Amino acid sequence: MLRTLVAALLIATAPAEAEDRNPLIDYAGFQQLTRDVSAYRQGRLLSWNEFEKAGRQPRTLILDARSADAFAAGHIKGAVNLPFTDFTAASLARAIGDKDRPILIYCNNNFSNNKAPVETKAIRLALNIQTFINLVGYGYANVRELNEVVDFNDPKIGWVTTPVAT
């Protein structure tokens, strides 16, 4: 009897799995956005040569969504840093401007070096994935992604570091 009562209380007081209590978080919406973006993303993947050529076009923004520290330690020449954790409608508008502007993205997992500042992340959690989904979700659909693994020591990459002020 006591077991039945405890089980009934646990069931009655457990939150429903699908129920979102926070009206500012929409996990189901994020899952749908991810499904919607999946096929679109497949057509937006670039080789290094395509990425580099696209990066030379007027108005094209090379967006590095890694942390400010990682960006300062090294990034592709011409890239602009807006850390993924700082993505908001306002910060994206300031950094990108026009929602039709061509955007190129890359992340740690595009580099074979696997050392600071581009330690390889878990492949399912590669920053490119979240960055792509979020940019499209915020209305910046003209985004393309580097889909090649390169060595940042290769001169063609144009890897630069930001000098640390002393």
Where do the protein language model's features map onto the residues?
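Hydrophobic h-region of N-terminal signal peptides that target proteins for export
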Residues: 7-17
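Rhodanese-like catalytic fold shared by cysteine-dependent sulfurtransferases
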Residues: 16-43, 72-76, 80-81, 87-166
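Short hydrophobic beta-strand that contains or immediately precedes a catalytic carboxylate
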Residues: 61-66, 79-82
